[in-house]
Design a protein with these regions (language model features):
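Phosphate/diphosphate-binding glycine-rich loops and adjacent basic-rich segments that engage nucleotide
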Residues: 1-14
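Active-site donor-binding loop signature of nucleotide-sugar glycosyltransferases
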Residues: 2-3, 39, 65, 120
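ATP/adenylate-binding site constellation spanning eukaryotic-like Ser/Thr protein kinases
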Residues: 4, 42, 133-134
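A general structural signal for well-ordered secondary-structure junctions
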Residues: 7, 17-20, 99, 150
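Phosphate-binding site of ATP-dependent enzymes
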Residues: 11-90, 94-96, 107-108, 112-114
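ATP-dependent carboxylate activation and anion-phosphoryl transfer catalytic cores
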Residues: 78-176
Length: 176
C-alpha cells in the first residue's frame, strides 16, 4: 500500500475474501484481527539452519543469502560467513534448545537483523546447507545411535552458490 487509505481498502478486501473462504472458520474467534500487516523492509533476506544434536546442544549455524524465491520458498542461495546472523542463530538456539534443525528466516535492513519466522524442521533452504557440505540426516542417525558424526558433516563451506531445479521425468511411456 502506498498510503493509509489504500491500506484500509486492502485490509477491507482481505477480510471480505477471508469471510468468503474456509479461513472464516479459523478467524471466527477474533474476526477483527484476521489480517496481519507486515512492514515491508528493504534489504537482504537470509535463511539460517540452526543445528542441534538430539540433546538440544548447539552444533552449528549455517547462514545462506537468499538469491531467488519461488512460491515463498528459497529457490537459489549462497552460503555466507555472516558473523552477526550466525550469532543471532546461536542466541535463538540457546533459547529454544530444540533438537535437530531450526529453520530461521531473517532479514537485514540498514544494518539491523530481523527474524521473520522460525520453524523446527527441515526447511526449503536446507538443501543449500547440504550442498555446502552439511549432512544433517547422517548426523541425526549417528546421534540416534549414540555416536558422534564426523565434524565435516556439520561444517558448511562459505561461498557455495546453488539453485533448485524442477524437471519433468518420464519413467515409462505407456504403449497404445
Amino acid at each position: 500500500a502506498d498510503d493509509e487509505e489504500e491500506l484500509r481498502l486492502l485490509v477491507k478486501k482481505a477480510r471480505r475474501e477471508i469471510r468468503a473462504s474456509y479461513l472464516k472458520y479459523e478467524s471466527q474467534e477474533n474476526p477483527d484481527q484476521c489480517v496481519l500487516i507486515q512492514e515491508k523492509l528493504r534489504g537482504q533476506e537470509y535463511g539460517l539452519d540452526v543445528i542441534h544434536d538430539l540433546k538440544g546442544n548447539q552444533r552449528t549455524v549455517v547462514v545462506k543469502e537468499k538469491e531467488a524465491m519461488r512460491s515463498g520458498e528459497t529457490d537459489g542461495a549462497k552460503t555466507v560467513d555472516h558473523e552477526r546472523l550466525r550469532r543471532l542463530g546461536q542466541i535463538l538456539g540457546s533459547l529454544t534448545r530444540h533438537k535437530g534443525n531450526l529453520d530461521v528466516d531473517a532479514f537485514e535492513s540498514d544494518g539491523v537483523c530481523y527474524v521473520l519466522e522460525m520453524n523446527a524442521r527441515f526447511g526449503g533452504g536446507y538443501p543449500f546447507s547440504h550442498a555446502a557440505g552439511v549432512n544433517l540426516p547422517y548426523a541425526l542417525v549417528k546421534w540416534a545411535l549414540g555416536q558422534e558424526p564426523e565434524e565435516k558433516y556439520l561444517a558448511a563451506r562459505a561461498g557455495v552458490r546453488a539453485q533448485k531445479d524442477i524437471r519433468i521425468m518420464i519413467y515409462k511411456e505407456e504403449s497404445k
